[in-house]
Curated annotation (Swiss-Prot):
Species this chain originates from: Drosophila melanogaster
Pfam family, one: RHD_DNA_bind
UniProt-recorded name of the protein: Nuclear factor NF-kappa-B p110 subunit
Gene that specifies this protein: Rel
Record-annotated site: Cleavage (when cotranslationally processed): 545-546
Phosphoserine sites (modified residues): 431, 950
Motif Nuclear localization signal, residue numbers: 452-457
Outcome (variant: residue 545 to A): Completely resistant to cleavage
Gene3D superfamilies: Ankyrin repeat-containing domain, Immunoglobulins, Rel homology domain (RHD), DNA-binding domain
Region: Disordered, residue numbers: 23-46, 453-496, 826-877
Length: 971
């Protein structure tokens, strides 16, 4: 017979109970609780037994589970918590130093693992005071003491997306699981802190499922001694070490499907053994564990995990006692999964399409699921609001191996637009509404018939009234006939007739509006006397021209003819001879194009003639300029959409470009392929045409950011063709063109130079320095790669090293200096590879004008900048003297020796003299990449023309008088 204490669930206190059975189920199996032979606790009343049985069978999640059990807020549950009868600490099972468990472990309290044992709270006297750790003796803290209870708090969440790798992919080095706020520098990692506790503890990190408080089949590994150690991972914290645990260098190994059950079962079994403080489980427990694992393995999300953090105290006997409820991180999604990975469009087959839609478009994308992906086209206004959207059409079979989508573009909302419309393309995953970033630009081009109609309309307004022999239908912008005019004496009054003779105005208000117009008033003012003699206005009835219109009498026909002749005479007298000639030239110009098979104008033909008829072409340009027909020239394009400038660039006839620009031809007009004349010149490698554009003074400024239908600017085309001289001229004209990304794959000029593996172009681009250099270096293309990352993928050590030398570190500005050895090698290699018939590539010196310590401006001019200060004796010397002195080996070596010595005074006596010299000569921007005085003097030697001798000498005198004397008096 046993004497046991049981907790009275109804009265909220412990009572003594005599039991002659050894059952641990809470009551004797041999005696009914209703028997009158014994004194039973009220805890064994039928109602209580029913509730107790229901409670024991409940599958309650841990305290930190995002899914609260249905009974969490029930009156019965609240009564248990208020009375202190149940120690609900989430997934914890408190174990005292003697190995006796206390607290209640429900079915899910051990990571959602089933347990067939019920643990009751011992009597208060049995709980040693030293085991409380901020809790009351019943294991619960009162409301007033919550702030003193040990608890874990996540300081840094893990990244939202991380690549899960298979074990076969774990060779070599890979990125670790970083924190959500991690940057290139500084990096952060998942971090958790233990609060309200001042003793030694262990913080454990393990991998859990997102929808259950249960381990995940994937492995959370840390590389140690060339091997991967699987979770859980433990970190010791204490008052001396601090209570912040940072888990670094962790990776996630994706478990193959055929091993999911095995790995999950092993993890759950190990965790249950640890929590029960046993060596092995019973056969029944193993069987139930297998069944539970089978259920979880079927529905487990293999592309989403989370971290579980737990805190323990290790007792003297080796028992691990939980200190606080576990906490769980945000979900970590598999970056390479089609279901949860990051969506990204890497490249478009073409960035343009027609407004009618149904154009085939191929998208190269990151991994997507064919059953869970959409391609969205959308347009935004100036405020970023979506004003139009549509989805591309494609079948599941059009998604090729999860990395390419062949789709048909949707039609644009307005099929009659007469200009290009810029929209965007993005991917959408309907399951979680994830969208690709960045959205790539796409251009809708108008229909050719609309463009042709627009071009004809531009010239037709003048053409309609161009000739004196034209019909009076278009004269003076008046109606075909004016029915209310009174003819000369002798003619009948027109108002006596019921029908009007007007064919253009059907309502009285239209006529009134016309009469009240400014043009009509001017007509009356300019020729009012003649009008009074010829016609008298009569406000007769103006009726609608119907089908039953009365026949016009013969005398009325004479009236119409008389008025037509009248207005024709007025028109001839009103138009000056030069205007008549203007209209005739314009008419011939347009008619010739319309009657031509390729719709070439006279200007197109004389420029593109096989034999360059310079005199004839120049005369034609002069005539067009004389009559100010620039609008006609810009609007009348041939069948290919080429202007006269396009044709001149195609035929490599640069001598026509400046006259055409002077006449007002637009150099930014695009042809049907989206190419401007400058695109054509670069594509055809006609350097003289490029120079004519860049050196001319066009009335319309050249726009080097315009892209063609392939998404390329002229600079992109020059880099792709590896044309150093063309790229150099374009960059000299507009440095901002370097940062323009092509619309096909998002690569800027630096990206493309890396892909071409051209060190010469890289140095050219990096030398064209401005305040945006750091942005260019850190810019990502559509695939999310920076130029340095692309270079590392190409594995060209020379290119990688060059970019690393200028790449910004730790928030510093990008280095504004290209190693001299690299430039010398480029010069020598360019000289050797240059052919006799090609332009020689030379590396010009780039001069630096230092305005202050934070801004450095470079001059791309070919000649060095020389500055003299007549007020100082030293500045009267040629600045090149500094270069000559430093080329003297004795002086150079001696200065290096002196400047590499410690300063010996000031706030930092150990600071080297050359560093102080760099600050005083405004070269502080470069000091962080210099290792010693040799680097400083090498820079001054190269850039001596931009470093004043007097400034350098005065700074050197303040830093080291001995070095100053050596420089001023080298003899």
């Amino acid at each position: 017979m046993n004497m046991n204490q049981y907790y009275d669930l109804d009265n909220g206190k412990n009572v003594m109970f005599m039991n002659d059975a050894s059952s641990t189920s809470g009551y004797s199996s041999s005696t009914s609780p209703n028997s009158t032979n014994r004194s039973f606790s009220p805890a064994h009343s039928p109602k209580t037994m029913e509730l107790q049985t229901d409670f024991a069978n409940l599958n309650l999640p841990g305290g930190n589970s995002p899914h609260q059990p249905p009974m969490a807020n029930s009156p019965y549950q609240n009564q248990l918590l208020n009375n202190g009868g149940i120690c609900q600490l989430g997934a914890t099972n408190l174990i005292n130093s003697t190995g006796v468990s206390f607290g209640v472990a429900n079915v899910t309290s051990f990571g959602n693992m089933y347990m067939d044992h019920q643990y009751f709270v011992p009597a208060p006297a049995t709980v040693p005071p030293s085991q409380n750790f901020g809790y009351h003796q019943n294991g619960l803290a009162s409301d007033g003491d919550i702030k003193h209870v040990p608890q874990l708090r996540i300081v840094e969440q893990p990244v939202e997306k991380f690549r899960f790798r298979y074990k076969s992919e774990m060779h070599g080095t890979h990125g670790s699981l970083n924190g959500a706020n991690s940057k290139r520098t500084p990096k952060t990692f998942p971090e958790v802190t233990l609060c309200n506790y001042d003793g030694p503890a262990v913080i454990r990190c393990s991998l859990f499922q997102t929808n259950l408080d249960s381990p995940h089949s994937h492995q959370l590994v840390v590389r140690k001694d060339d091997r991967d150690v699987c979770d859980p991972h433990d970190l010791h914290v204490s008052k001396e070490r601090g209570y912040v645990a940072q888990f670094i260098n962790m990776g996630i190994i994706h478990t193959a499907k055929k091993y999911i059950f095995e790995e999950l079962c092993k993890k759950k079994q190990d965790r249950l053994v640890f929590q029960m403080n046993r060596r092995e489980l019973s056969h029944k427990q193993l069987q139930e564990l297998h069944q539970e694992t089978e259920r979880e393995a079927k529905d487990m999300n293999l592309n989403q995990v989370r971290l579980c953090f737990e805190a323990f105290k290790i007792e003297d006997n080796g028992a691990w006692v939980p200190l606080a409820p576990p906490v769980y991180s945000n979900a970590i999604n598999n970056r390479k999964s089609a279901q949860t990975g990051e969506l990204r469009i890497v490249r478009l087959s073409k960035p343009t399409g027609g407004v009618m839609g149904n154009d085939e478009l191929i998208l190269l994308v990151e991994k997507v699921s064919k059953k869970n992906i959409k391609v969205r086209f959308f347009e935004e206004d100036e405020d970023g609001e979506t004003v139009w959207e549509a989805y591309a059409k494609f079948r599941e079979s059009d998604v090729h191996h999860q990395y390419a989508i062949v789709c048909q573009t949707p039609p644009y909302k307005d099929k009659d637009v007469d200009r290009e419309v810029n929209v965007y393309i993005e991917l959408i995953r309907p399951s979680d509404d994830e969208r690709s970033f960045p959205a790539l630009p796409f251009r809708y081009k108008p229909r050719s018939v609309i463009v042709s109609r627009k071009r004809r309309r531009t010239g037709s307004s003048a053409n309609s009234s161009s000739s004196g022999t034209e019909s009076s239908n278009n004269s003076l912008d008046l109606p075909k006939t004016l029915g209310l005019a009174q003819p000369p004496n002798g003619l009948p009054n027109l108002s006596q007739h019921d029908q009007t003779i007007s064919e253009e105005f059907g309502r009285e208000k239209h006529l009134n509006e016309f009469i009240a117009s400014e043009d009509f008033r001017k007509l009356i003012e300019h020729n009012s006397s003649d009008l009074e003699k010829i016609c008298q206005l009569d406000m007769g009835e103006l009726q609608h021209d119907g089908h039953n219109r009365a026949e016009v009498p013969s005398h009325r026909n004479r009236t119409i003819k008389c008025l037509d002749d009248l207005f024709e005479i007025y028109k001839q007298d009103r138009i000056s001879p030069i205007k008549i000639s203007h209209h005739k030239v314009e008419k011939w110009f347009i008619e010739h194009a319309l009657n031509n098979y390729n719709r070439d104008t006279l200007l197109h033909e004389v420029i593109s003639h096989k034999k360059d008829k310079l005199k004839l072409a120049i005369q034609t340009i002069q005539v067009m300029n004389y009559f100010n027909l620039k609008d006609v020239v810009n609007s009348t394009l041939n069948a290919d959409g080429d202007s006269a400038l396009h044709v001149a660039c195609q035929q490599d006839r640069a001598h026509y470009i400046r006259p055409l620009l002077g006449m007002g031809c637009n150099p930014n007009l695009k042809n049907n392929a989206g190419n401007t004349p400058l695109h054509v010149a670069v594509k055809e490698e006609h350097l003289s045409c490029v120079e004519s554009f860049l050196n001319g003074v066009p009335t319309v400024q050249l726009d080097l950011s315009l892209t063609n239908d392939d998404g390329l600017t002229p600079l992109h085309m020059a880099i792709r063709q590896n044309k150093y001289d063309v790229a150099k001229k374009l960059i000299s004209y507009d440095r901002t063109s370097i940062s323009v990304a092509n619309t096909m794959d998002g690569n800027n000029a630096l990206h493309m130079a890396v892909l071409e593996q051209s060190v010469e172009l890289l140095v050219l681009i990096l030398d064209a320095q401005n305040e945006n250099l750091t942005d260019i270096l850190q810019a990502q293309n559509a695939a999310g790669h920076t130029p340095l990352e692309l270079a590392e993928r190409k594995a060209n050590d020379r290119v990688v090293q060059l970019l690393k030398n200028v790449y910004p570190e730790k928030g510093e500005l990008a280095m504004t200096w290209i190693p001299c050895k690299v430039k010398e090698e480029i010069d020598s290699s360019s000289d050797e590879s240059s052919d006799a018939g090609q332009l020689e590539i030379k590396s010009e010196e780039m001069d630096i004008e230092t305005k202050d310590e934070d801004s450095v401006e470079l001059d791309l001019s070919s000649g060095p900048r020389r500055q003299k200060d007549e007020s100082s004796r030293d500045t009267e010397m040629d600045n090149n003297k500094l270069q000559l002195l430093l080329k003297n080996k004795f002086i150079y070596d001696r200065l290096c020796s002196l400047l590499n010595q410690p300063l010996g005074h000031g706030s930092d006596p150990q600071d080297r003299k050359w560093m102080q010299l760099a600050r005083q000569t405004h070269l502080k921007q470069f000091a962080f990449i210099w290792l010693g005085a040799e680097d400083l003097l090498d820079h001054v030697k190269r850039k001596g023309a931009s470093v004043e001798f007097s400034t350098f000498a005065r700074a050197l005198q303040a830093v080291d008088p001995q070095a100053y004397a050596l420089l001023v008096n080298p003899t």
